Amino acid sequence: MATSHSPTGQTVAIIGAGPTGLSMLKTLRNDGFDATIFERRSRVGGLWSYTEDETMTTALPNTTANISKYTCGFTDYPMPDHYPPFLSQSQFQEFLESYSTHFGLQDHIVFRTSVTEVERNVDNTKWCVKMTTEGKPVTREFDKVVCCHGYQTQAKAPTFPGQEEFQGRIMHAQQFRRPTDFKGQNVVFVGMSSSASDVVPLVVQNAAKVYVSHRRGTWIFGRWRNGLPTDLLVNYTRRQMGYFMQSWFPDLSAKLSKMATTFLMKKYGNLDPSWRLLEDAPPLSLNLTACMDTMLDLLREGKITSMHGVESFLGGKKVKFMDGTVLDDIDTVIFCTGYRADFSILPFVEHSTPENDAQDNAFGGAPIPRLYMNIFPPKHAESMAILIASTYGKNNGFSFADVISMAISNIWRGVSGDMIPSVPEMERAIDAHHQWIAGRWVKENTTDVCAVKQWEFQRFLHEAAGTGLENLGWGWKGWWTWLRDPKMSYLMRHGVETAYAFRYFETGKRAVWPGARDAIIHTNALVKKLRAEKLAETKKE
């Protein structure tokens, strides 16, 4: 059993001042670490901090969160009641700045600083963090490093035959800033993703014609369902049941998920077969979904045209699609094809390709980072945490950021140090995980190679953080919670899945928040009020 030790004097560099970086800074400093954030932007917020710099991924001024304020937030800092159910980019920015100010984090953030490389120093005792501050190169040494610079940093863009001869403009959604740049143009979007749902409605208002090219169908969810935010359909109990099914009955879970999603999609009304939205859509368990209800409206109104996947460029301004259709007057092609994490500043991270016994089961994806629990490089688990490679691992936006930061702090302080096995054990676990990734890739080759097993990933981090959620389980602790406080037991199991629950139970591993109980009750009351208001509106109609 590992022993707890004081981290006083240990320096930590945190890369990135988005929600995860801010949570990490607050937690580490509260636990005694001398932590500092290095952020390339001029303010906190990560991608929620709008920037004109086209090399950075940013939420646009019209971007609206996909997750409601009721389930998205920090564990000890509630969102103000006056915010709407779904926050805008500026409101998220405002909230994150208020969080930073409230907890006195600003004094420990170095802005306008880009980290260019992280490597071990000459005597292998510390990390050398190379950075550029105000255009000047600087190198500083730290005991530990946490990478929170996001998994949406590098734009992914396909290449097509004849692309170099295209006489129009080809760009990625990452570069999009001003919709007026496309006034009077014919524009093709490649990919039907969350970024497309942000950009397409803006371009439609200015362009002459807009086409959306997609090779296959996609699952489209609206933010609202029966008058309530869609994310409120999931509560703690349903999530745990889902994890159980995914873990023990993955094929059945995938089939049931597809059936349920198809049912929900059809609730949006008639879907024109020519849109191909339900045609060969990738399994939900292997790909993330998008809130794209606005896209459905644009399709119905004829303001955008659904096209098959791009096959090639034919010279001039011609684009050929996989069904043989050719459009010969396209001014701009915008790739909405996603992002990948940037490992270029972390040259020490090892990558490998899963071995396959059978050729027909061969993994053909890119080499996968070798990280235990998709966080810790085995040789440096005691001093390096990489939080840019855990796709599907988080629930409810950045509400999980506090769980991750508490877990890492506890592991490094020795409070949960026994949860990190030996290097050989970590290597074996990584090999097994990569085989799981390979199996997913064979079924769906667009799946993210940084995916995690949610049930395994979250169980590990909750235990390391000491959130005490085992008190909501089906064991004796769960029954004891119900007997002592049936109201809270019911609200946390079947009510709104709030972040405050992560600081409700006393476990001795992390600080509880005295306001957690009231915040959980208040959030559920707000949702109950919202439901009543929506019901009243429906009756009036």
Labelled PLM ranges:
Residues 111, 218-222, 383-541:
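C-terminal, flexible cofactor-proximal segment of oxidoreductases
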Residues 52-80, 232-240:
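N-terminal glycine-rich dinucleotide-binding loop that anchors FAD/FMN and/or NAD(P) in oxidoreductases
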Residues 84-149, 299, 313:
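Feature captures the FAD/FMN-dependent oxidoreductase FAD-binding
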Residues 73-82, 276-280, 383-390:
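Short glycine/proline-rich turn/loop motifs
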Residues 293-298, 302-304, 309-311, 315-342:
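Glycine-rich, aromatic-lined ligand/substrate-binding cores of catalytic
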Residues 4-44, 49, 97, 138-140, ...:
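Rossmann-like dinucleotide-binding core of oxidoreductases
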Residues 133, 150-151, 175, 334, ...:
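Short glycine-/small-residue-rich Rossmann-like dinucleotide-binding loops
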Residues 67, 336-413:
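Glycine/threonine-rich phosphate-binding loop and adjacent beta-strand/alpha-helix elements that clamp
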